[in-house]
Regions:
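Short, Lys/Arg-enriched N-terminal segments with co-localized hydrophobic residues
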Residues: 16-31
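Basic helix-extension-helix modules of the SAP/HeH family
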Residues: 35-88
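Acidic/aromatic-lined carbohydrate-recognition and catalytic surfaces
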Residues: 83-154, 158-190, 200-455
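Aromatic- and carboxylate-enriched substrate-binding clefts and catalytic-loop regions
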Residues: 264-265, 269-285, 518-539, 564
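Active-site-adjacent "subsite" loops/lids of carbohydrate-active enzymes
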Residues: 288, 447-495
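Active-site-proximal helices and loops of the catalytic beta/alpha 8
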Residues: 425, 429, 444, 448-470, ...
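An active-site-proximal structural segment forming one wall of the substrate-binding cleft
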Residues: 427, 496-511
């Protein structure tokens, strides 16, 4: 049994920062939603049909408010959310539009030969529906990660064909055997006379049982904000070197883990975001945690340049010596000049090979993050001019051709920070910590960040994530983070989600998932509206949690879900059954009927 105390004061401070940032963002020209909506008169629509359309698209039509009352979601909110998900309706749509959208939604799976992504628990036998033109024969097989495979057996499950856009479509049912091993596999379907089509088939653990939780041990640890742990030898903001030192101190004191804030990427232009819970990307790391002097190529710099770097560091420390606040901007401005010099130094043969391998593994996703970083530095803002707001625009591609060295520099920064941020967990393990670094996963990303810029089709334009009204915030909360569209995420094979989990787990022995309820449902609210105008959008939690477990199992990592707040009772039970630990506020844990702290048992 494992619980983590949550400092409420810090949480309150984080919400304050989010609200201030939101107001600043609304003043920019970079609106994510250019549509002009009209108000809907619910009396003019068949609400039963609209609610049905919402239901089959995973959009909540009602919820229980903080007072316990049953709240109905209005027509305007439902139509705006559905529109943002790619459903062909919007405020002002007619009943005929809604009926057409219902038909299109119900036809969609019949138009696909294979489901977008199939996620199955290991040991479960699952039906796989394959759709073909009526009367066509089809063969299905699977290929495992290791290259081996086998045929899938077709079951005798006749289903009446469906008329889809004037074409009769049939359904064949195949069986996915429960004997398949866990992993990211592929299923294939071959219709007579056509090229085979494929789709992801993921077999995930029923439950994770990390080796460190196999016995009766009880663990304790320390919670620290990495950026605040700044040493006299650093650059005014805590970095990987400082975090490794803190990790060593905690290990020597007998701690089993060190819980830190999210290490997701931030912008590298002036006006850097203070909150680590509003990153520009969750798939990449925060390069401000680099310690320049610890980069191997630093030692090859001419003495003059090393002296200049040390002088710049000392001057920075003198300027902020009497300050109680954390100065990210001046720290990074001084540090980045040093890193530019180090980047230009020749690398040894093996170091160059390692860097090239890192870039190759990063693929197009790393290329785009580096391009976005170079663009924002060139412009001096994350609010890019219109011609650069698309990763594939002509202007963006021209910039990429003309600034290849800057793009390579930002790839190099990611390589260096990934090396250095691996130190704290390595030190912890060497010195006897049972768990090591406990990483933290933020809920989402900045609307002007590289994740949204790189993959706009996966995000819901014109929507933000937040929380419904409650006793403390009767207008609700707006976290100003664009959400993923569930169906679009599935069409990618959940690749963006997999990247985020992998990035966090490669640096840690455990992972805390902030607002883990977001794997089940998220409160969406339209841009420009209060949170009270929102509704819940549901995700395929079996797929999301299953992928999370598969990545954790491969790293023998512990998972902790931050499950505070309004939670449906079955959710905590479900998480526990899958091996994900929960969170409690320490100060509120009392023996029943007393003011005594909860007993250790």
């Amino acid at each position: 049994f494992f619980r983590i105390p949550v400092p409420m004061g810090v949480a309150g401070w984080c919400f304050l920062q989010v609200e201030v940032s939101f107001l600043a963002y609304l003043s920019t020209e970079a609106s994510m939603n250019d549509d002009v909506f009209t108000t809907v008169d619910p009396d003019a629509l068949n609400m039963d049909n609209l609610r049905h359309l919402a239901d089959i698209n995973g959009v909540g039509t009602s919820y229980y408010g903080w007072t316990g009352g049953h709240e109905e979601v209005g027509a305007t909110s439902l139509l705006k959310v559905l529109h943002a998900m790619g459903v062909d309706v919007k405020p002002g749509s007619s009943d005929e539009d809604i009926n057409r959208a219902i038909t299109a939604t119900e036809d969609a799976p019949w138009l696909r030969t294979l489901p977008a992504t199939t996620v199955v628990r290991k040991g479960d036998w699952r039906d796989l529906w394959v759709h073909v033109n009526d009367g066509e024969s089809v063969r299905c097989w699977y290929v495992l990660e290791d290259g081996t495979g086998g045929d899938l057996q077709q079951l005798d499950r006749p289903v009446p064909p469906r008329d889809v856009q004037g074409q009769l479509r049939g359904r064949a049912t195949f069986e996915i055997p429960g004997t398949l091993p866990t992993g990211y596999h592929t299923v294939f379907a071959e219709i007579e006379g056509r090229e085979p089509v494929s789709a992801p088939l993921y077999i995930v653990p029923q439950k994770i049982t990390p080796s460190r939780l196999s016995g009766p041990q009880r663990y304790w640890g320390v919670n620290a904000q990495a950026y605040s742990v700044a040493s006299r030898t650093g650059w005014g903001v805590g970095d990987a070197w400082d975090l490794a030192d803190l990790s060593a101190i905690c290990a020597q004191e007998g701690a089993d883990f060190l819980l830190i804030n999210p290490l997701h990427a931030s912008e590298t232009v002036k006006g850097m975001e203070n909150s680590p819970y509003r990153p520009v990307s969750r798939a990449w790391l925060n390069v401000t945690y680099i310690r320049p002097e610890a980069v191997p190529e630093y030692a090859t710099l001419p003495n003059r340049q090393r002296h200049q770097i040390e002088q710049a560091r000392e001057q920075l420390m003198e300027e902020i010596a009497d300050e109680d606040q954390i100065h990210r901007d001046p720290s990074w401005q001084a540090k980045s000049k040093a890193l530019r010099w180090i980047f230009q130094q020749p690398r040894s043969t093996h170091r160059e090979a390692e860097f090239n391998a890192f870039c190759l593994a990063g693929g197009i996703e790393q290329e785009r993050h580096a391009l976005w970083s170079a663009l924002t530095e060139s412009v001096g803002s994350t609010d890019l001019p219109k011609e650069y707001r698309s990763a594939t625009s002509e202007a963006t591609q021209k910039f990429a051709e003309e600034h290849s060295a800057d793009i390579e520099y930002h790839k190099w920064l990611q390589w260096i920070v990934s090396e250095q941020l691996a130190w704290p967990n390595s030190v912890a393990k060497k010195l006897g910590m049972q768990i090591g670094i406990m990483a933290d996963l933020a809920v989402g990303t900045h609307p002007l960040g590289s994740d949204y810029w790189s993959m706009p089709g996966v995000f819901a334009s014109g929507m933000y994530v937040g929380a419904p009204p409650d006793m403390y915030s009767q207008l609700g909360q707006n976290w100003t983070q664009p959400p993923w569209i569930p169906s679009k995420l599935a069409e990618t094979g959940y690749e963006p989600f997999r990247q985020v989990i992998r990035a966090a787990l490669k640096l840690a022995g455990a992972l805390r998932i902030d607002h883990i309820l977001g794997l089940f449902r998220l409160w969406w609210l339209p841009e420009g509206e209060t949170a009270a105008a929102g509704t819940y959008v549901y995700f395929d939690h079996e797929a999301m949690v299953g992928i999370l477990l598969l990545e954790a199992e491969r790293n023998d990592a512990i998972l902790i879900g931050e499950d505070l707040g309004t939670v449906e009772p079955w959710v905590r039970t479900y998480l526990g059954e899958r091996g994900i630990l929960g969170t409690s506020v320490f100060w509120f844990e009392k023996e029943e009927g007393t003011d005594l702290p909860l007993h250790a048992d």
